[in-house]
Amino acid sequence: MRVLLFLLLSLFMLPAFSADNLLRWHDAQHFTVQASTPLKAKRAWKLCALYPSLKDSYWLSLNYGMQEAARRYGVDLKVLEAGGYSQLATQQAQIDQCKQWGAEAILLGSSTTSFPDLQKQVASLPVIELVNAIDAPQVKSRVGVPWFQMGYQPGRYLVQWAHGKPLNVLLMPGPDNAGGSKEMVEGFRAAIAGSPVRIVDIALGDNDIEIQRNLLQEMLERHPEIDVVAGTAIAAEAAMGEGRNLKTPLTVVSFYLSHQVYRGLKRGRVIMAASDQMVWQGELAVEQAIRQLQGQSVSDNVSPPILVLTPKNADREHIRRSLSPGGFRPVYFYQHTSAAKK
């Protein structure tokens, strides 16, 4: 087994990995490099995926990866979204819909940090945990980067970028008690410890552009000394828009990538964004479900490597496995046909 490594990746270190190598996570700070292996679906398995929402392009890109993998492997895919975070009852009802459809595996992107009675509800159906951890004992495999790292990497970048200069940071990590918000804050705090980078406040709210914009305006009124906004892609989008109205533009850092954040990088309005390569994660989730259904070995937690993107290196080649193509619309149902499998 390769030596466990503390994840201090930058984009320029990624060539040390093979293009298709994965990371198998042992905890939030240690991983083993794992080679990808070929896969062939033995039949048209029926997979049902649940997302918190598709109003955030993070999940849209993941949806693209899933439907591409479903087409590649010749399996059926049904997708349901809850309309937002903290929608436990909705997602519980959606699992029942998956079962009525005849799903053979559930790919669960939870809208909450826990999912009570999951074992009772799914019975013997395999569950692949998708992006958001719920720490349920019946979940045998998770696809996703530890959210700790998605906060740590931006924090580490800011410390290096500041060159010892004090920075006053507003953190906007997303919804309270969901979506990895707590873990991203913990990662950011760990990265800036001992540096002059200071967290002024933490603003929690759903990943909705109006909610994030209102939160940002409220925080800027309360803390006029804020000069950096670090948070979700939706928060970054709000900060880019708000910056136009300020004498001194806000410095913007995003904990993950979206189409808007990518455009911000290209225009120099976002100085850094982490990417956990969402399209690739969607593909991985489908692959893990197929392996589990076929009795093959699956790792307990795998993900693509994290990319650290800046205006200097944000190009199409580096984001091709991160973002869905322009014009892509959500695919809620993909059904295998003989032609599709060829």
From Swiss-Prot:
GO terms for molecular function: DNA-binding transcription factor activity; transcription cis-regulatory region binding. CDD domains: PBP1_TorT-like. One of its GO terms (cellular component) is periplasmic space. Keywords: Periplasm, Signal, Transport. Its main location: periplasm. Residues 1-18 form the signal peptide. GO terms for biological process: anaerobic respiration; regulation of DNA-templated transcription. It holds the Pfam family Peripla_BP_1. Transmembrane segments: none annotated. InterPro entries: Peripla_BP/Lac1_sug-bd_dom, Peripla_BP_I, TMAO_TorT. It is found in: Periplasm. SUPFAM superfamilies: Periplasmic binding protein-like I. Belongs to the bacterial solute-binding protein 2 family. Upon binding a putative inducer it probably interacts with TorS and allows it to play a role in the induction of the torCAD operon for trimethylamine N-oxide reductase. This is Periplasmic protein TorT. It comes from Escherichia coli (strain K12).
